[in-house]
Amino acid sequence: MSSEDTLQVQQYGPWAVIAGGSEGVGAEFAALLAQAGLNLVLIARKPGPLQTTANRCREFGVEVRELTADLTSDKSIDEIISATADLEVGLFIYNAGANTHSAEFLDGDLADFQRVIDLNITTMMALTQHYGRAMRDRRRGGILLVGSMAGYLGSVRHTVYGGVKAYGRIFAEGLWLELRDHNVDVLELVLGVTRTPAMERVGLNFDVPGMRVADPAEVAREGLEHLAQGPVHVAGGNGVDVARRNDPDRARVVAGTHRMMQRLLGLD
């Protein structure tokens, strides 16, 4: 980041909390913030990648705390709040929003769908409220919530996931309105297809002709650069695709995007 960018990010210090900060876009957020001089609390489920990212960030001379937590569990909320109680958190990034249960709705398990809701809504809301209150009192800070283009229309096997992602965008827009007069920035960073370990594990076909595949480092940089602008930024040059997904002819746009998704997943 340039010195100008560093100064912009420094207003969100001295500590940043990144939920989902071990790999992919989350790890790139961590590296950029460490370069800018922010201390970090990195939260993830897998200790191995978490430690690797933490050590990478320590090379920039910042303090890094690692916290292994299952963000689908309500116990994680109290654990995270307790582990950061002594810190002045000026930036909260919620990057933990994967689809943990990909199944057609009538065939899926409700308990598994509930975990998708808890990961993407329940835990996100609780932590956002906790850190957001302190930021509002200090009259400075930033909240960055990572969203998905899946939240712009319905999709087979993403019925619940698409719904929670739509919720996240509307939530961010409302929170942005509530906090903008308190000098607290709010942004939902909307991701399209991004070459992350999580998307690779799902088995996405990145070689579909015409598919736009974003780089995690560039996506993270876009998010930090647009944080002060809020409330929503579509990453990876996908703005035109998102506009198309808002077409009022819902049958046409949903069916058309479904065909593209089938190719992306190698199911056509």
List the model feature ranges, each with a label.
Residues 19, 89-97, 120, 145:
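Rossmann-fold scaffold of SDR-type NAD(P)-dependent oxidoreductases
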Residues 128, 164:
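Active-site helix of classical SDR
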Residues 15, 22-24:
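Conserved glycine-rich cofactor-binding loop
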Residues 148:
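Residue(s) in the substrate-gating loop at a strand-loop-helix junction
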Residues 188, 204-245:
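C-terminal helical subdomain
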Residues 36-53:
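Conserved glycine-rich Rossmann-like NAD(P)H-binding loop of the short-chain dehydrogenase/reductase
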Residues 78, 82, 91, 97-114, ...:
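Conserved mid-core segment of classical short-chain dehydrogenase/reductases
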Residues 106-126, 140, 168:
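Catalytic Tyr-X3-Lys loop
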